[in-house]
């Protein structure tokens, strides 16, 4: 897509790319946050020169917690088609205007921490056949405070210890021939986490309502 001839409706077909990108000099390439900025700027009626001069993947009007999570998640997806499907126009259009006060930002921060400990980590523990550790983390109460995080420390440290041992054993045993099989085994977990991460973003967005 070329910025000079770009129309708002064209952005629904924009491929969401990995990493940050320079301001468009003709061809438009954008990560999820940059695409969210571009959609917002065009809806505001900005001219092309202003879009270029203020191009950003960190919109001031976007919650820093949501922005940071989206950037990290965006770059963790290796497939352009999967990334573009997950960061749909509807999701991108919800990113601007999400910045709130410190209390709202803290609630969203705890939501992200809770997701990482009770959902993301158990998924990878199961890949290492550490079912007991995965179940222990999933059984933790929702983590929404320093006290809850402190109470989760023993289960987290146990999972981290066993997970480190499993990673070391896997690296020692892995060979070139196992690469494809390992990728196949990982795919369902990655797919499930992508859906779960999208749900987290939508919950963080809804937290202000």
Residue ranges of model-derived segments:
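Short, glycine-biased loop/turn motifs at secondary-structure junctions and
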Residues: 1-175, 179-209
């Amino acid at each position: 897509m070329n910025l000079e001839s770009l129309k708002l409706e064209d952005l629904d077909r924009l491929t969401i790319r990995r990493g940050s990108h320079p301001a468009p000099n003709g061809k438009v390439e954008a990560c999820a946050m940059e695409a969210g900025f571009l959609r917002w700027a065009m809806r505001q009626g900005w001219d092309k020169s202003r879009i270029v001069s203020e191009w950003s993947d960190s919109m001031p009007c976007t919650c820093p917690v949501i922005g940071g999570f989206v950037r990290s998640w965006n770059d963790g997806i290796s497939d352009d088609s999967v990334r573009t499907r997950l960061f749909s126009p509807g999701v991108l259009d919800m990113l601007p205007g999400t910045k709130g006060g410190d209390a709202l930002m803290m609630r969203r921060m705890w939501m992200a921490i809770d997701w990482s400990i009770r959902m993301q980590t158990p998924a990878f523990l199961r890949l290492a056949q550490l079912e007991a550790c995965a179940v222990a983390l999933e059984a933790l109460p929702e983590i929404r405070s320093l006290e809850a995080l402190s109470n989760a420390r023993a289960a987290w440290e146990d999972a981290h210890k066993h997970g480190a041992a499993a990673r070391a054993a896997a690296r020692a045993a892995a060979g070139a021939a196992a690469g494809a099989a390992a990728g196949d085994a990982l795919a369902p977990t990655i797919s499930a986490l992508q859906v779960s991460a999208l749900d987290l973003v939508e919950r963080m967005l809804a937290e202000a309502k």
